Amino acid sequence: TAAQPAVAARLEQAVAAWRVDVFGADIAAKAVEPRTSKKGKTRGAFVVPDDRPYPVGYREFPWTPLPARDGVPHGGVRRSSSAPNSSYFVNWRTTDDRITWDVEVATSGTYEVVIDYTCPVPDAGSEIELSFRDAKLAGKVAPGWDPPLNTNQDTLKRPEGESQMKEFRPLNLGTVRLEKGRGELTLRALQVPGKSVMDVRRVNLTLKN
C-alpha cells in the first residue's frame, strides 16, 4: 500500500462497493477487519455482523440440523478448535454451563429432538434439558459412548485450528411441541453425576406433525 497508494485506494473502494452490493449498505457499514493471530497473519475474511436467526421447521424441509458451528457456548463450554466449521462442543461439566442457538420456528408442531453426542462411559447419566420459550424437554445422557479421535484420515498434517473428528452417535431425547416464533434454543444440564455431561456435535430437530 505504501508503494502504490493510488492502486491501494482504488482496490479499497472496489471492496467497499462489493460489500454494499452483496450485504446492503447498513450491514456493509458495520463490517470489521479480520482478526489477526499473534504472528500477524490474517485469520478469515472480513467479519460482517448478522443477527438473522436460524430457520427451523419448514414443512417442505422438516429436518433442521443445528451444528455446533452455529451455536454459542456459555460458561465453561468450549469448541473443540478455534475454527467453528466441523467443530463440536467440549468441556461441558456443570449445571451453570449451557449451549444456545438463535432460531426462528416457522411451523408450530411436534418436533423430534436428536443430539449427536459422545460421553465417557463413567460419566453417563447426566440429566439434560432442551428449552425454547415456554417449551421444555428433559432426558438422560445414556448410554456412554467414548470413541477415539480419527487420527488416520489426513495425508498432510492438519492445521492447528481444525478439529480431529470422531464418531458421534444419536441420542433421542424425545418429542416436544414448539410454537411458531423466534427465541433462544437452550441445552443445559439439570444434574451432572460424573465429571462431564457430553460432547455435542449437533442438535437435530424434525417436524413430525
Residue ranges and their predicted role:
Residues 1-2, 9:
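C-terminal, low-complexity/hydrophilic appendages and adjacent surface loops
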Residues 8-209:
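Extracytoplasmic
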